[in-house]
From Swiss-Prot:
EC number: 2.7.7.18
Protein name: Probable nicotinate-nucleotide adenylyltransferase
Disulfide bridge map: none
The organism of origin for this protein: Thermotoga maritima (strain ATCC 43589 / DSM 3109 / JCM 10099 / NBRC 100826 / MSB8)
Family: Belongs to the NadD family.
CDD domains assigned to the protein according to its UniProt record, in alphabetical order: NMNAT (cd02165)
Protein function: Catalyzes the reversible adenylation of nicotinate mononucleotide (NaMN) to nicotinic acid adenine dinucleotide (NaAD).
Top-level taxonomic group: Bacteria
Any GO BP: NAD biosynthetic process
InterPro entries attached to this UniProt entry: Cyt_trans-like, NadD/NMNAT, Rossmann-like_a/b/a_fold
Coiled coil regions, renumbered to chain: none
Keyword field contains NAD: yes
Length: 205
């Protein structure tokens, strides 16, 4: 079953990107990745998909709160969409199901955006080879990427089909933001201003 935003978007072009994650919370690095991804890949639409029930870790903020923050941050941005698909689907949130879902809706092979650190354990992802077949993997830089690239090359082999984004390195992490908030430090510059105060209070406890 399609959401309202998905139904209204079916007449868009076929260059579709999927940007999944816990977004616990969404931060300025996520916004940077979105802007560069839209521009570099010339996407018709970038769909941000917060995880509902992650297979390997638990989130701190509930889905509804993370989804609300994402809507506040991205709703006014052109070609951006925030989807609650993984909550509507229910069960464990495996990326391959999300890829297959949007691939069927838009009748295209989508771009699937992940951080560079994901390359260090990508072979542990559920049906990871299907992810590589059914989407074009797009990797944005985080920290020092060389060890991740070497590991991915050993495990995955040819990386020529993977798109590595040429953009500033994303140094910030949601874990760091939660810790700063816990210590009562400002999150100015770390999270978008639209949600900063709310995020500081929520994780400040």
């Amino acid at each position: 079953m399609l959401s309202g935003s998905e139904t209204s978007s079916l007449n868009t072009g076929n260059r579709i990107g999927i940007f999944g994650g816990s977004f616990d919370p969404v931060h300025t690095g996520h916004v940077l990745v979105s802007v560069y991804t839209l521009e570099i890949l010339d996407l018709d639409r970038l769909i941000v998909v917060p995880v509902f029930n992650p297979p390997h870790k638990k989130t701190v903020a509930p889905f509804e709160k993370r989804f609300e923050w994402l809507k506040k941050v991205f709703e006014g941005m052109e070609k951006m969409e925030v989807s609650d698909y993984e909550k509507r689907r229910g069960g464990v949130s495996y990326s391959i199901f999300t890829i297959e879902y949007f691939s069927e809706i838009y009748k295209t092979k989508p771009f699937f955006i992940v951080g560079e650190d994901a390359l260090s354990y990508f072979e542990k992802w559920y049906r990871y080879r299907d992810i590589l077949k059914k989407s074009t993997l797009v990797v944005y830089p985080r920290y020092c990427g060389k060890p991740y690239h070497e590991h991915a090359r050993r495990v995955l082999g040819d990386l020529s089909e993977i798109v590595f984004l040429d953009m500033p390195i994303v140094q910030i992490s949601s874990t760091e933001i939660r810790e700063r908030a816990r210590l009562g430090k400002t999150l100015k510059g770390f999270v978008p201003e639209e949600i900063r105060k709310e995020v500081e209070v929520f994780y400040g406890g």
